[in-house]
Amino acid sequence: MNPARKKPSLLFSSLLFSSLLFSSLLFSSLLFPSAAQAAGEGNGRGPYVQADLAYAYEHITHDYPEPTGTKKDKISTVSDYFRNIRTHSIHPRVSVGYDFGGWRIAADYARYRKWNNNKYSVNIKELLRNDNANSGGNKHLNIKTRKTEHRENGTFHAASSLGLSAVYDFDTGSRFKPYIGMRVAYGHVRHQVRSVQQETIAVTTYPQNAASSVTTNAPIRKLPHHESRSISSLGFGAVAGVGIDITPKLTLDAGYRYHNWGRLENTRFKTHEASLGVRYRF
């Protein structure tokens, strides 16, 4: 699967998500004006829970050491196989926090979609070429080649992210409350690669006055290679968005968050997320 082929579907999903988000915000602002005003007059303090549906854009970049560097023999499977992954997922997220009436702190948990990729490559190399002639003077050409087939199957899964955020809500005197904040999270990533390779030797004969013929040996299969890694790392990010008070206890939340998961072997994993959710204060 070539990640570049996903661009049309990624664009369509992004536009669809944006349309739904705008419609929800417009609907809420028109439907609940009086209740939102009452919410703005409250002190806004207390514990809360929040549920979001997030659209995540996941991006892996490789960071190769120089050939003469000290890490030249530590090229990771992630770098070799998952270089420049760009994919997306839609996933739920839950948060539990406390609102201090301006500042909020929250712990959140999310689990992402597994990404799969398959690769197939073939290489044909000429090993020998002979011009021969039989006793009758008829010439024929023999060409010996080696065909190498390589198949790879891999998965990459941001299995979980457990984060802690500190957020500040700006009081605009209306139902709309923009916010910004910082986030630190402990992320868990799993990835694996399985590859198989086989070689086939073939001799093609081209007679002078006849059709060519091919003679092949049985394929020689090399032992399959399988590697699986599980990595945990501490990363940092930022959050921003706007809350719309629906009732004194219920708030519609439209947000964005950026998170750098940190260094995974010698790659860097980052996510950009747009989310829509509801926050209920007790």
Curated annotation (Swiss-Prot):
Keyword line: Cell outer membrane, Membrane, Signal, Transmembrane, Transmembrane beta strand
Broad class of where this protein is predominantly found: membrane
Segment forming the signal sequence: 1-38
Keyword Transmembrane: yes
Other facts: Expression of opacity proteins is regulated by the number of translated repeat elements CTCTT, which code for part of the signal sequence; the protein can only be synthesized when the number of repeats place the start codon in frame with the rest of the protein.
Function as written in the Swiss-Prot or TrEMBL entry: Implicated in a number of adherence functions. OPA proteins are implicated in pathogenesis and are subject to phase variation.
Protein's recorded name: Opacity protein opA54
